[in-house]
């Protein structure tokens, strides 16, 4: 297959970068400007809910639904920049990733990281969505882990590497890419 035809097939934008560089902020700006329906998930470390022993809880929330905090969506804890995953927590969310979405909706995965890399059902659901035609806007950690490498190297994905220096101008580039995917 020619290089040009591979690029033409790409449907999904992956925002790749280190911790705290602005991946989620960029995604939020793009989504607000696109003004379309969005489904998917976002993960959030809740520092204000920190437990002295365990650290800060990390939850997964369905985009568009009210946030809640329960065992059902608790993924693990982060203490001193080290995470402890709750076994099978991501796998419990896998079915939600594969639910049908209305026409004209984009998917947002904020973010795909290393905690879920050992959760087969969740990883398979992410890869199945990447194989599909619904445009995806996702934040992806820049760690060298087999699952994350598989996501970043997926033939349907275009990686946008974010830095503190380029993050403001990258918004327009990602926005243009996503607009083109929605219009197809």
Language-model region placement:
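Phosphate-binding P-loop
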Residues: 2-10
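Hydrophobic anchor at the beta1->P-loop junction of P-loop NTPases
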Residues: 15
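The conserved Walker
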Residues: 19
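Conserved lysine of the Walker
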Residues: 23
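Hydrophobic positions on the alpha1 helix immediately C-terminal to the Walker A/P-loop
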Residues: 26, 30
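N-terminal phosphate/diphosphate-binding loop that engages ATP/GTP or pyrophosphate donors
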Residues: 31-81
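Phosphate-binding/switch loop-helix module in NTP-utilizing enzymes
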Residues: 77-127
């Amino acid at each position: 297959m020619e290089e040009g035809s591979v690029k033409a097939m790409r449907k999904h934008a992956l925002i790749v970068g280190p911790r705290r560089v602005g991946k989620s902020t960029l995604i939020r700006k793009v989504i607000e400007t696109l003004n379309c329906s969005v489904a998917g998930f976002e993960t959030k470390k809740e520092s204000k809910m920190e437990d002295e022993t365990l650290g800060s809880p990390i939850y997964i929330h369905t985009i568009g639904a009210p946030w809640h905090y329960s065992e059902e969506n608790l993924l693990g804890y982060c203490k001193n920049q080290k995470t402890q995953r709750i076994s099978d927590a991501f796998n419990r969310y896998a079915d939600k990733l594969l639910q049908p979405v209305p026409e004209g909706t984009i998917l947002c995965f904020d973010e795909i990281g290393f905690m879920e890399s050992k959760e087969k059902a969740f990883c398979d659901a992410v890869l199945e969505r990447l194989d599909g035609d619904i445009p995806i806007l996702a934040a992806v950690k820049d760690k060298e882990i087999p699952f994350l490498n598989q996501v970043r190297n997926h033939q349907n994905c275009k990686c946008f590497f974010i830095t503190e220096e380029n993050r403001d101008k990258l918004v327009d580039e990602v926005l243009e890419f996503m607009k083109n995917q929605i219009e197809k």
